[in-house]
């Protein structure tokens, strides 16, 4: 058996086992050393390949695809700095718990550390951001080695998705010649080699005595508060809102919790909290007896102030798997159990009498209604960033996905995207919270050909402009709502804005770019809108079109700050007056 046959069978058995383990998509960036992986993935009948030239964009595309599908996506690149360009997306995947299979080609061992071209240190190059690293053996095709390569494939996929999902890195040292021979018989292996390991996990639950202790400490007839951070389980919304309804307590719902949209019970859902928790005097009126938080911390800084001011309040954090995600410094009990199952069990165990007090819930509901009234009222002659979110929420198609950029975009969605009977999957890269890779992530989420609306700022689009190529090349159904305030709008809300000498150069960073020309470059449908009605019309039009659309909303940074502050002041005055 010559080396080409060994290489072909080795790589083909690896790829076939990934497919049998459930991997359906691979994102490939061109390169020579990765030729065997790229060609074999492309030839496999059960795996869809996506070709994206820039590795940084490719990795974020895969991240968006994996986040949307809740399953591992493979990425393939050649040796050298190509692999280094994956780093930002790997960091984001680690912190936001998204499963990625990173498959890097490498020079064989005899070419390392001697100055061979395109050769860098790839062993554990992503450090602690991976759940597992493995240096693959050199290609061989003995029965033992084909069992080995299949075992590593199935194990890699399982590790990426088990527990807290994350990144697995397999490094493939490959010698020349690199081109596989697809004329070989039984290239995908024989039946005896397939499905080396079948791995299944059960649902993690608290023991009955733990549930009873928890129920005695919390439950109805106390001023409790549910807080819901980002969630991916479609059944969670029904479970937590049903329990909240039985206990008569409010549910603070981050936009990524999936509680603001859908058909579940929403009477207890509080969506305007970011606006009214800004005021210290209001926060003082809302001291809870306990807080139960599901998932990571919400986006809202106002909520962070609130929870940190209630340092003596017992806080419980419910996570499906081990790991601490809490920077409030509060006394916290971490309970590692499936959140949906826990809510269902607590509801079944709860016996509620007819005298459950609703005063605590009503206080939150009344403040919430006041906040929503002022946040949603009025129509400006020139569209504001908050109105852009309001208009988007009104016309976005039921059953579609909203991918939200970081910085001001996610904060405006937190403030202005209110509860709706539509079912909208709201996603964002809130692991490391960077603005890089946002275009590619949103485009990746549209890879299943279901409509995605991407809301982001001009710096985010500029930072990842070449992410538009995949949308153009594959004609993916994505509408980009571009909030162009000509720079870093969020800094205008921060203390840095007070130093006028260096603010524009260091923080405002105006670029004066023509995004209409960007749209032309990538053959996108383009609209520039000036009012909320124009935005809604442009959105509706884009949803009838195929492929990529860019809708530009131009705003002024200083006016945007003043508009937000005026809203917050009206809410503060109205709540304190009623109180």
From Swiss-Prot:
One of its GO terms (biological process) is menaquinone biosynthetic process. Its cofactor is Mg(2+); Mn(2+); thiamine diphosphate. This is 2-succinyl-5-enolpyruvyl-6-hydroxy-3-cyclohexene-1-carboxylate synthase. It catalyses: isochorismate + 2-oxoglutarate + H(+) = 5-enolpyruvoyl-6-hydroxy-2-succinyl-cyclohex-3-ene-1-carboxylate + CO2. InterPro entries: DHS-like_NAD/FAD-binding_dom, MenaQ_synth_MenD, MenD_middle, THDP-binding, Thiamin_PyroP_enz_TPP-bd_dom, TPP_enzyme_TPP-bd. Keywords: Magnesium, Manganese, Menaquinone biosynthesis, Metal-binding, Thiamine pyrophosphate, Transferase. Transmembrane segments: none annotated. Homodimer. NCBIfam families: menD. Belongs to the TPP enzyme family. MenD subfamily. Pathway: Quinol/quinone metabolism; 1,4-dihydroxy-2-naphthoate biosynthesis; 1,4-dihydroxy-2-naphthoate from chorismate: step 2/7; Quinol/quinone metabolism; menaquinone biosynthesis. Its EC number is 2.2.1.9. One of its GO terms (molecular function) is thiamine pyrophosphate binding. It holds the Pfam family TPP_enzyme_M_2. Disulfide bonds: none annotated.
